[in-house]
Amino acid sequence: MKSKELNLHTLYTQHSRESWAGFGGHLSIAVSEEEAKAVEGLNDYLSVEEVETIYIPLVRLLHLHVTSAARRNQHVNVFLKHPHSAKIPFIIGIAGSVAVGKSTTARILQKLLSRLPDRPKVSLVTTDGFLYPTAELKRKNLLSRKGFPESYDVKALLEFLNDIKSGKERVEAPVYSHLTYDREEGAVEVVEGADIVIIEGINVLQSPTLEDDREDPRIFVSDFFDFSIYVDAEESRIFTWYLERFRLLRETAFQDPASYFHKFKDLSDAEADTMAASIWESVNRPNLYENILPTKFRSDLILRKGDGHKVEEVLVRRV
């Protein structure tokens, strides 16, 4: 039976916003409105009420997984007579469409997890830095496919994750500039001594094709994850958020002469909407249906958003 014929929803317990809020228990992590606003993505929305209702229970669940993994690793190291093995970070993957709010979810989780009683060190890395540089994309004739699986240096991403899970003390990731639409030459994101690492990106639950992996062992990015989250919403909502974000960028970042999109700064509202819709239909929508949405049920937890970026339902995988 093909996977698309399976009712994969049965793999998950489903929780309404109201019932999920009750799982926060006695965990209390203070977050001010200013702090919530500071981690918002462009055109995203995050209130203290959203933090308390959705993210505090999620952090409590994640903490259970983190502590359980630490105990298991300790027992295995004793069994193998390696009681002083290197610290292995717990890795959380966050996936979902462009404009769905992954970055906001990643940043608020980083803030909340770092405020747990044991004060873990939490690092956040986005996979944007692993996009091939623009010059390389042009050379490979992939610029129009930017964001699709083939536009990422997956080998470098896998090496980065392998170093983390191998206990390497200091690991570096390339940094991406949304202003120049390219890697920042010479800039790196350093992961050093982390207890938890969050990896955020549209591609993190995707698997390579047989052709891509013909020469190498079939290792997926998600093989390195201890827990994965998919941020979900109806396509119509995501498109609306994308359109609104494009308008805001035209009024802000596009005005900067250093912006890759500076040439679009004087577009009228109608012209901006037309361009955004064209990009959505030619790039983001196909990528969503071909590569991102099919990975949803590979995640351990799904955050399903409704109007205003508010999470309406949480699905937690049973196995």
Swiss-Prot record:
Any GO BP: coenzyme A biosynthetic process
Matching NCBIfam families: panK_bact
Gene that this sequence comes from: coaA
GO terms assigned for molecular function: ATP binding; pantothenate kinase activity
Binding site for ATP: G96, S97, V98, A99, V100, G101, K102, S103
Localisation per UniProt entry: Cytoplasm
Stated name of the protein: Pantothenate kinase
GO cellular component, as recorded: cytoplasm
